[in-house]
Amino acid sequence: MQKQFDIDTAVKTLHIGACEISMPKIRGAQNNVFISKSGIDGSEYVYKFNSAEMVLKNELVAQMLDARNIPVPRVVAHSAGHQWFEVYPKIPGRTLYECIGDGMTPDDIDGVYADILDLFAQMSKIDWRPIYKMQYSQTHDVVKANVTGVNNKFMGKLYSEAVKLMNRGSNETYGLYHCGITPKNVIIGHDGHIAALVDMDEVAIANKNYAFGMMAAKYQQLRGNINTLIDSYEFVSGQILDKKRIHTISNITNFGKRLMWLMGRRKQIHQR
């Protein structure tokens, strides 16, 4: 992670009056996301630091999803010296993670997932060819980069190869999907509906069953019934999913995330 001085300097090349630059309260494992306030009108912006290739890919996929009326941040790529980052106005609302922590009812959670299924169906219609030749256009490459950054090269390669295996399929099953639809990446607006899906790193070319399995893994952790989720999607989309494969992917994903969390904790302890 960059030093705070470097972060402040980079942010202020774009927003000179930026202040209160800090990490969000709810964040993932990468520790590369920051929020600032404008010293002029108090408006807030989100900055995510990454490689130039990842930032440019994220800017493009955000545009592709937005063109399908899928709510995502208006990502703009920016560079300051050797540092690259994406920036967008902070989305009003709270993460689904926060809402669940504050006692969101199971019925309301199911309502959010019903909206997610509609968005997932829209993703299946996106032409992914414009990003095919870009670096990090494939979901296993995204996994390799992010897991390596959080853990190490060995874990990055291990997870990348596992994703390659789970992500296999025929050409007609591939699409441009958000493969990280978790409660931390879903922003709920004041009306109780989805205001945005965030973390454009996770948007990549993927097999439909793999992407659905990644989303279903978290639903399973919330005590949801994956079969019901699959049946609902097939009803609203008219598409058939591979139930057995999705169950396998969800189970492997939940085991893998637990292992990665333990490895990350071990790394943090050794760095102290």
Features from the language model and the residues they span:
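An alpha-helical support segment within catalytic cores of ATP-dependent transferases
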Residues: K3-H15, K125-P183, G189-H190, R272
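Conserved N-terminal boundary motif of the eukaryotic protein kinase catalytic domain
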Residues: I16-P24
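ATP-binding pocket architecture of kinase catalytic cores
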Residues: M23-I131, K153
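Active-site acidic catalytic loop and adjacent metal/ATP-binding pocket
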Residues: N32-S38, V163-Y210
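Short amphipathic alpha-helical segments and helix-helix/interface helices
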Residues: A62-Q63, F120, Y159, V163, ...
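A short, local hydrophobic-aromatic micro-motif
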Residues: P73-V76, A195, G213
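C-terminal subregions of glycosyltransferases and related glycan-biosynthesis enzymes
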Residues: H140-N146, Y159-E161, Q220, D242-F255
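Active-site activation/catalytic loop segments of kinase-like enzymes and analogous catalytic loops
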Residues: N209-Q239, N251-I269
